[in-house]
C-alpha cells in the first residue's frame, strides 16, 4: 500500500472552494479541458511567461504556525516606557474573543450596504460619539489610518478652509511627536506647503500661517494651556488642529472647549496592542460647519422605508470615488476593526472606568516624578499627564544601557535627557523598579508616603469640567455577560464572509483562514513598540525581509516597501517615488499624470496629492484604454509626462491585450508606469507587472494576500518597484533611509503582516498560481451562467473575463424601471451581499467571486440572480406591479412579514423566494435606508438613536 506521507500543499484545498469534480464541470461549461488551457486563453500573448514565481510546495498549517512561532520568538519583549504616541494597554478578553477573533467582525466589508451592516455601523457610531465627547467637537469620523496621516489630513483640511488664502505656511509645534512631523513634511512638499516647526511659546507673529498643529499633552510630557495661542491664530484667519491623547482627555479640558477647529490623534491605547506600530485607529473631529470637508467616512443616522431609525455612511458624495482629482483626500478606507475595538473598550469600561484608568496612570506618574526629584534628578515638567522628561546629563547613555540590561526601554531624547511614559499596564512595582534604576545608589523613596502626599500634575485651568459618555450605551454593558451579548447582537445584524459569499468586484473578498489569523494576537508580535531598539525586533526584521522577497517574487519587482498602511497610501508612495526619481534626474517639469477615464477615483485624487496634473485618456467601446488617444496625449505632453496610472487587469475586469504597448508608449515619452495592483488576484503566478512594463505597483494585502477587510479596515498597501525607483521608497526615522515617511510607523500595520506571510507560505508558488486560475475560472463560470439573463458588459477578444465580470442592468432600468439598487437590495432577501454597484460603469453590477467560493455557493448566487431576472420580467410584462413589487420593496424585514400585509405579492415570495432559504434565513434588521433623509438631517453621534426610538 502506498501512502502519501507528505503534508505539503494540504492547505491549498482548504483555501480553494471548488472540489476537483466541480472544477472540471465548470471548465467543461466553458469549453476547456484544463485550468492551463483556460489560463492560456485568458492571458494575452504579449505577457505570457512573465511570471517569475517559483512553483514550490506550500507548508502545512502546522508547519507554517511552527515556523512563524520561531520567527516571533526572536522578538524581545521589554518593559517599555517609550511612549511617543504608542502605549501598552490591556485588550479586554471578551473583546479579544468576541470581536477581534470573531470572523463575523473581521471578515465583513465596508458598510456601503447599510441594511446588512447595522451592527458594525452602530459600533462605529459609538466610536464617533466617544471621539466627539472626549474631544469636545461635534463631528467625528469613523477613523483614519494613523495619527501621522490624520495630522497630514488636518494640515490640508486647514489649507482648504483657512481664510488666510495667501499663506502657504503651516506651523507645527516642536512638541509634536517626531514621526508626525516627518509625515507632515512628506505630505506638504508636493503641495507647496512650508511646514514651519518651532516652539509655540516663543511664537510672536502668527500672521504668516494658514493653520497650526499643537500636541496636547506635548510629546515630551508638558501640558500647555493653548487658549490664548488659539485666539491669536483665529485672529489671523488661521485654523488650529490639536493632536490630543484620547485617554488624557478624560481628565483634561477638551480641545473643542479651548477653541480648536480640529482634533486628531490615535485610539490605540483604548485596548489595541502596540503591534510594532499598527494597525491602530486614528480619529479626526471638527466643528459642524466643516463637516463636508472632513476626510474619511462618517456614520450618520437616517430612517428606513418604515420610518424606523437606521444607520448609514453619510455624505459619500464628498469622497474620492465621486470627486476624483477634486477630492479632499485619497483615503478610501478606515480602520474599522480597530475603531470598533476602541469603541467597545469605552463601552466596557464606561466613563467611570476610563477616568479611573487615566487617574491611576496620572497618579503613578505624579508619584514617580516626586520620587525622582527626591533622588536628586531634574524632572523638566511642572505639569503633565503620563510622560516625564529627565535631565540626566552625562549619565544618559549609561542609564539606557543599564535599563536595557534589566529588560527596560526608556525613551531616547538626546545625549542629555531621557523620557518615561507610563500606561495602563504600569504598576507600583514598576515605579519602584524605575526609582531603583535611576537612584544612582541613593535609598529608594517610600511609595506609600509619596502616594499619600502627592498632588495632581494637571493645572486646575486644564482640568476637565464637562461630563463624558453620558449615553446609555457607555453605561450599560459593564459585565462580561452583557458585553458578550451586545457584541453577539450587533454581529447578528450583519452579513459577513462567515455567512455568505461577498461577490464585490475589485474587492477580492476571499477566505481569511484561521491559521493565518492566529499569530496576530500573539504577544511576540503585539507587544513590541515600533521605536524599540532594533536588536529587540529581530523577528519582525526576519518577517519583513522574507515577506518583501515573497512579494518581489509574486510581482516581478526588485524591491518592496511594506510601510503604506492602505492601498491609497501605497498609491501615494508610488507616485512620490516617481516624482522623486524625475527630480533626481533634473526633470522637475515632469508633472503630468495620464489616467484612463475608467480608473477608480483614488487614482486622480492621489495624483493631485502628489503634486501632479491629471490628464484623462479615453477608453474604447470594449472598455479598454484607447491606445491611439493615449499615444496622442503622451506625445502632446512628452516634455511634462511624469506617469501613467493604469489598473491591470483593467477596472472592467479584462486582460487588455495592449498592455505592453501601452507601457512602451509611456516609456518612449519619458514617463513611468504605475500599475494599480487592486486586481493582482488574477495575475499571481500567471504574469508579473514588474516584467511586462510596470515601474511601480501597489498591492492590496487585504485583497490578494488574505488580510481581512475588518468591516472597512485595516488594509496594507505595500509597493513594489523596479530597481531604479528603489532609492525613492518611503523612509522613516527608525530606518536607514530617514526621509519620505508616508505613515507614522516604519513598517505601517506591521502586526497583521504575519497573515500574508502565512498565506504565501502555506500556498507555495504552485498554490498561488492555482488560486489565480480558480479566481479566473469562478468568474468566468458566473459570467457564462448569467450571460443569457444579463448582458456581460466587457470581455476579452476570446469572450472571457479575468477574475471579475460586469453585468449591465441599464437596459432593465429602461424596460422595467428596476434599478441596480433594487437588484442589490433584493439580493439581501436571498441572503447575499450585493456585488459592486455602478463602478466602474453606472447602472452595472461588478461580480468577483474569488477562488475561495465553492461551486455550490456560485450556483446559489447565480440561481438568485436568475430568479431576480424572472421577477424583473414579471414587472416588464405586468404580472408584478411596477412600483409595489419585491424588488422595489427589498429588503423585507421580519417585522414587515408579521405585520399587516398589503402588497400584491405573497409573503413567501418576499422572504423565501427560493426553497433553500427555509434552512437558513438572514433577516435584515431594517428596511431600505433613506439616503437623502440621512444627509439632510445629519446626526453622527449616539443620543439621537434613543430620541428617534422615543419619537
From Swiss-Prot:
Per the record, residues carrying N6-(pyridoxal phosphate)lysine are 703
Q: What class of enzyme is it?
A: oxidoreductase
Cytoplasm: is it a keyword of this entry? no
Assigned keywords, A-Z: Oxidoreductase, Pyridoxal phosphate
GO molecular function, a single term: pyridoxal phosphate binding
Which cofactors are reported in the record for this sequence? pyridoxal 5'-phosphate
Q: Which reaction does it catalyse?
A: N(6)-[(R)-lipoyl]-L-lysyl-[glycine-cleavage complex H protein] + glycine + H(+) = N(6)-[(R)-S(8)-aminomethyldihydrolipoyl]-L-lysyl-[glycine-cleavage complex H protein] + CO2
Quaternary structure, per UniProt, is: The glycine cleavage system is composed of four proteins: P, T, L and H.
Q: Family membership, please give it.
A: Belongs to the GcvP family.
Q: What does this protein do?
A: The glycine cleavage system catalyzes the degradation of glycine. The P protein binds the alpha-amino group of glycine through its pyridoxal phosphate cofactor; CO(2) is released and the remaining methylamine moiety is then transferred to the lipoamide cofactor of the H protein.
What is the protein name stated in its UniProt record? Glycine dehydrogenase (decarboxylating) 1
The gene it comes from is gcvP1
